[in-house]
């Protein structure tokens, strides 16, 4: 059985104390003597010690020497126990240095635009006025006779990305079979409600722009829709017949902000 060489012989194979040289494949290089004992004794008895300079040393050479010494020791010893993961981990931790891996990600990249949940519904204000598309981009509130109830707008209410708080649920309101969504924009200094045409290949989506998003709040048997972009501004109707639906800031007054919602079957 092969025997482990004496530590002094192992050291002399790589280091000359007299000339302060570290011998490499390409020839000797002058180095200042500053040595350290590296202990591989965790593998068992018969420790092997290796002297390596801390200044101007070749890191790759040190790794090669470490591997050679470790493997020679493993080959030369007859182990009483099975080689375990901890033994390999001890060798690898001696050879390699751990460095943290930093991942840089953008929160926007983490947003998932998977299938958007939505429901179809109709809205009437508390005065039972229906919402009707009067022209391509104008939504009005008026009383409809029973034979004209088919004129009522059917909304596709999508549940979108946003903060849910105080029973307020972020939603977007699109018109069924139309590429139109209710949105809030500022005209002058006043927030205004409008119908905005969108690309059907893109909308609806989970991460809707804030101008499209409203907080839906249920109050008894009615619902309110508050603009996320302009807090305390609500989808409103007028007491006057056939007036456009608008964005108002007064609740419980002349402006009507509460609606009855009828959910339709899929």
From Swiss-Prot:
Marked site (Important for interaction with integrin) residue numbers: 168, 178, 187, 201
Translocase keyword on record: no
GO cellular-component term (any): lysosome
Keywords: Cytokine, Cytoplasm, Inflammatory response, Lysosome, Mitogen, Pyrogen, Secreted
Compartments where found: Cytoplasm, Cytosol; Secreted; Lysosome; Secreted, Extracellular exosome
A GO molecular-function annotation: integrin binding
InterPro entries, per the entry: IL-1_CS, IL-1_fam, IL-1_propep, IL1/FGF
Location (main, coarse): cytoplasm
Propeptide: 1-113
Biological-process GO terms, alphabetical: cellular response to lipopolysaccharide; cytokine-mediated signaling pathway; defense response to bacterium; fever generation; immune response; positive regulation of cell division; positive regulation of immature T cell proliferation in thymus; positive regulation of T-helper 1 cell cytokine production
Entries under CDD domains matching the protein: beta-trefoil_IL1B
Gene3D superfamilies named among the record's database cross-references: 2.80.10.50
Matching PROSITE patterns: INTERLEUKIN_1 (PS00253)
Keyword Cytoplasm: yes
Signal peptide: none
Database matches in Pfam families: IL1 (PF00340), IL1_propep (PF02394)
Any further remark recorded for this protein: IL1B production occurs in 2 steps, each being controlled by different stimuli. First, inflammatory signals, such as LPS, stimulate the synthesis and promote the accumulation of cytosolic stores of pro-IL1B (priming). Then additional signals are required for inflammasome assembly, leading to CASP1 activation, pro-IL1B processing and eventually secretion of the active cytokine. IL1B processing and secretion are temporarily associated.
Record function comment: Potent pro-inflammatory cytokine. Initially discovered as the major endogenous pyrogen, induces prostaglandin synthesis, neutrophil influx and activation, T-cell activation and cytokine production, B-cell activation and antibody production, and fibroblast proliferation and collagen production. Promotes Th17 differentiation of T-cells. Synergizes with IL12/interleukin-12 to induce IFNG synthesis from T-helper 1 (Th1) cells. Plays a role in angiogenesis by inducing VEGF production synergistically with TNF and IL6.
Oligomeric and partner information: Monomer. In its precursor form, weakly interacts with full-length MEFV; the mature cytokine does not interact at all. Interacts with integrins ITGAV:ITGBV and ITGA5:ITGB1; integrin-binding is required for IL1B signaling. Interacts with cargo receptor TMED10; the interaction is direct and is required for the secretion of IL1B mature form. Interacts with HSP90AB1; the interaction facilitates cargo translocation into the ERGIC. Interacts with HSP90B1; the interaction facilitates cargo translocation into the ERGIC.
PANTHER family associated with the record: INTERLEUKIN-1 BETA, INTERLEUKIN-1 FAMILY MEMBER
Family affiliation: Belongs to the IL-1 family.
The protein's name: Interleukin-1 beta
Organism annotation: Ovis aries (Sheep)
Taxon lineage: Eukaryota, Metazoa, Chordata, Craniata, Vertebrata
Primary gene name: IL1B
């Amino acid at each position: 059985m092969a025997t482990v060489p004496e530590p002094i012989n192992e050291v002399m194979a790589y280091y000359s104390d007299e000339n302060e040289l570290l011998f490499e494949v390409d020839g000797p290089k002058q180095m200042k003597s500053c040595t350290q004992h590296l202990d591989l004794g965790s593998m068992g008895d018969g420790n092997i010690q290796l002297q390596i300079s801390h200044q101007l040393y070749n890191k790759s050479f040190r790794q090669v020497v470490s591997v050679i010494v470790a493997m020679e020791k493993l080959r030369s010893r007859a182990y009483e126990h099975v080689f375990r993961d901890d033994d390999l981990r001890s060798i690898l931790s001696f050879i390699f240095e751990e460095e943290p891996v930093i991942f840089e990600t953008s929160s926007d990249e983490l947003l998932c635009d998977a299938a958007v949940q939505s429901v179809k519904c109709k809205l009437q204000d508390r005065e039972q006025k229906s919402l009707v598309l009067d022209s391509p981009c104008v939504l009005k509130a008026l009383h409809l006779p029973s034979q004209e109830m088919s004129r009522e707008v059917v909304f596709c209410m999508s549940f979108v990305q946003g903060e849910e708080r105080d029973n307020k649920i972020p939603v977007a309101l699109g018109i069924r079979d139309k590429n139109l969504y209710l949105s809030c924009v500022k005209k002058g200094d006043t927030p205004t409600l409008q119908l905005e045409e969108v690309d059907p290949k893109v909308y609806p989506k989970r991460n809707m722009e804030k101008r499209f998003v409203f907080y839906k709040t249920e109050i008894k048997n009615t619902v309110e829709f508050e603009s996320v972009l302009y807090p305390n501004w609500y989808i409103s109707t007028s007491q006057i017949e056939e007036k456009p639906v608008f964005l108002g800031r007064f609740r419980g007054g002349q402006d009507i902000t509460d609606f009855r919602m009828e959910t339709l079957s899929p």
